[in-house]
């Protein structure tokens, strides 16, 4: 980013602009290099103004809580926009249908949406309590767990493009699959960018590039008590099955059809395998944990080891849920 140009624009922006921002502070793995530029918008309008001020060739990464994201130790040449400070509103949205709607901004934590829906006697969003990221990331990759998937409850989404133009889009404008969301008109398989769309580099800047600002979820009337009980059960299962006491990014790989990535990795004898300060969890083999001083390179080495081992033993190419960006 041309910082002189950014400084010229600063007077009209209300958010916080930082340079050489350590990404380890902002990703759930607590490891990795720095972003050349970071911006924390004051609200959605400020985010729009910032995007309009950016040079057209500036790579942009939008993120919330940094779940499913790893920035290599050499850092990221581009701008990271953080949504979790300001774009976190969750409120009722009356859809005029049987049930009700919940409007949630991209930076709102997914579990917050689940709890809000339950408090308002709306059912169908309970599974979001098991997704550690934000709404933006859940939309970008169709995050899911415990039998639920994000786009199964989406009524419509609000987006913004590189030029700062806002749109309202419906699910039929996207090709939605398991951990995959691609806008139909975005040729070349370009993926709408959210918190952690699972590919390994920033896309070439394009005016067709869009990010999710918010979603309205279409939910059914239900029993708040039953929803809260279901959320409690889900969280108990998560605590029992996953290494939540150590920094991690959730599931590293998608589950292959008819199988589980964790089973395949464990069958390769990799459970508990360490590289530097990182380790394939001895509690859940599809998790890689930071034991306290891991570098991004340590984590990536274990990802590559798991991919190579499963390919050699089973002939299965594991697909990543996590996104790795930046330079080694």
What are these regions (language model features)?
Residues 2-135, 145:
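Anion-binding (especially nucleotide phosphate/pyrophosphate-binding) glycine-rich loop
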Residues 17-19, 25, 31, 69, ...:
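Phosphate/pyrophosphate- and phosphate-bearing ligand-binding catalytic cores of soluble enzymes
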Residues 38, 101-103, 156-158, 214-216:
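Beta-strand secondary-structure signal
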Residues 40-41, 70-73, 81-82, 116, ...:
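Short beta-strand-to-turn element immediately C-terminal to the catalytic PLP-Schiff-base lysine
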Residues 69, 114-117, 125-129, 142-149, ...:
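A generic local secondary-structure boundary/capping motif
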């Amino acid at each position: 980013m041309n910082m002189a140009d950014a400084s010229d624009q600063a007077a009209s922006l209300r958010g916080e602009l930082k340079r050489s921002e350590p990404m380890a502070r902002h990703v759930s793995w607590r490891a990795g290099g720095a972003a050349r530029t970071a911006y924390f918008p004051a609200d959605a309008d400020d985010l729009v103004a910032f995007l309009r001020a950016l040079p057209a060739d500036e790579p942009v990464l939008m993120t919330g809580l940094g779940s499913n994201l790893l920035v290599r130790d050499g850092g990221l040449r581009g701008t990271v926009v953080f949504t979790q400070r300001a774009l976190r509103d969750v409120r009722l949205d009356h859809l005029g249908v049987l049930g009700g709607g919940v409007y949630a901004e991209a930076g709102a934590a997914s579990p917050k949406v689940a709890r809000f829906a339950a408090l308002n006697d709306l059912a169908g969003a309970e599974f979001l309590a098991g997704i550690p990221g934000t709404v933006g990331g859940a939309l970008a990759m169709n995050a899911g767990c415990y039998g639920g998937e994000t786009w199964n409850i989406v009524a419509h989404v609000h987006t913004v493009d590189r030029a700062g133009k806002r749109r309202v889009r419906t699910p039929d404008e996207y090709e939605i699959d398991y951990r995959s969301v691609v806008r139909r008109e975005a040729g070349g398989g370009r993926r709408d960018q959210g918190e952690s769309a699972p590919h390994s580099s920033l896309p070439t800047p394009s005016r067709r590039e869009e990010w999710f600002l918010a979603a309205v979820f279409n939910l059914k009337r239900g029993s708040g008590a039953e929803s809260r009980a279901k959320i409690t059960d889900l969280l108990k299962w998560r605590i029992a099955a996953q290494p939540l006491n150590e920094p991690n990014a959730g599931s590293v790989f998608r589950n292959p059809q008819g199988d589980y990535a964790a089973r395949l990795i464990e069958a390769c004898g990799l459970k508990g395998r360490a590289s530097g300060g990182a380790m394939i969890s001895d509690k859940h083999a599809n998790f890689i944990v930071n034991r306290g001083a891991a570098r991004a390179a340590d984590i990536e080495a274990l990802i590559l080891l798991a991919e190579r081992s499963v390919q050699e033993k089973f002939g299965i190419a594991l697909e990543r849920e996590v996104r790795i960006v930046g330079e080694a």
